[in-house]
Amino acid sequence: MHATETSLPLVSIIMPAFNGEPYIGAAIRSVLAQSYARWELLILDDGSADRTAEIAEAFEKSDPRIRLFRNPKNLGAAQTRNRGFALAQGEWIALLDCDDIWHTDKLEKQLALASRGDILYCSYALIDESGKHLSDFLVPESTDYEAMLRESVLSCSTVLLRRSILAGQRFPTEYYHEDYVFWLELLKAGYRAIACTEVLADYRLVKGSRSSDKRNAAKNRWLIYR
């Protein structure tokens, strides 16, 4: 696919970035390698103390689809993603953490299911800090509110959201596992979640960071919401 095919829906990719110097380059390159080329990448640096913003800026200069924004202070992942929602122009919104990687056909294969759902997700691989494959997390073809209470299968770097469902919906900032609460809110509102069950993303487990808790994020914390 080519970026000139303007009849295709635009995908806004929101990438929060905080001290991601070792990994952000690989994350951005995985977006550039997508077979589906009609996207914009919004990188939001959240007060990094390393070269994260510098690396992102170099990519911004090389491709007009990439834009870098700097938070005036450290806001945290939830508020940073919410800022990205406000900046996004696409019909679909994707999320990609700066230490994760997409497979080249991720957007194309998920968007092939766009007519069936409002939330599109996929299976993913777990990798370590060096990129070594650890295991696969295979997801069911669909999920709903009750199913998500039993098992969390939606993960930020796998999800595409129809922009129209986000009116008034934002990541809550009062919970530690705000992403899980956010998915529950969308599903409880009746939005349809459909999966491409193929492994289309790599989730990197980084020691000492919240990313090491990705796969089981708040699986049993639904009580705070229910």
Can you name each region flagged by the protein language model?
Residues I93:
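Short aromatic/hydrophobic "clamp" motif used to bind/position activated sugar donors
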Residues S30, A37, D45-E54, K73, ...:
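A conserved acidic beta->alpha catalytic loop
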Residues N71-A88:
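Glycine-rich, basic loop-to-helix element that forms the pyrophosphate-binding segment
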Residues P9-S12, S30, E40, V181:
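Cell-envelope/extracellular polymer assembly enzymes that use nucleotide-activated donors
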Residues P22-G25, D50-A58, I101, D105:
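Acidic helix N-cap motif at the loop->helix transition within catalytic regions
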Residues V11-Y23, A27, Q34, L44:
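A conserved hydrophobic helix/loop-capping motif in glycosyltransferases and polysaccharide synthases
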Residues D105-L134:
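Conserved donor NDP-sugar-binding/catalytic core segment of glycosyltransferases
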Residues A86, L138-N216:
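Conserved nucleotide-sugar donor-binding catalytic segment
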